[in-house]
Amino acid sequence: MTVEILSKVERAEQVLHDLGIRSCRVRHHGEVARIEVEQGDLQSVIDARDHIERRLLALGFRYVTVDLGGFRSGSLNPHEPTTAS
């Protein structure tokens, strides 16, 4: 990850912090920003979706998504589910 990408993610997370959302992550997937928040903050994100999208698009993301799985530490590269044989 480059310094530029880290800075972009940090600024995107600050947008959420400014809305009072403390436990959050913005995951960088190229043109996509994947937002993770605690389940209790999901409604706040939905209520502010226009503001959040506008701010993250201005940072250079092309798409802004919300991960319905919520905030998970270490979910940048989730493991593939395993199947029993």
Q: What does each model-identified segment do?
A:
Residues 1-85:
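ATP/NTP-dependent adenylation/nucleotidyl-transfer catalytic domains that generate, transfer
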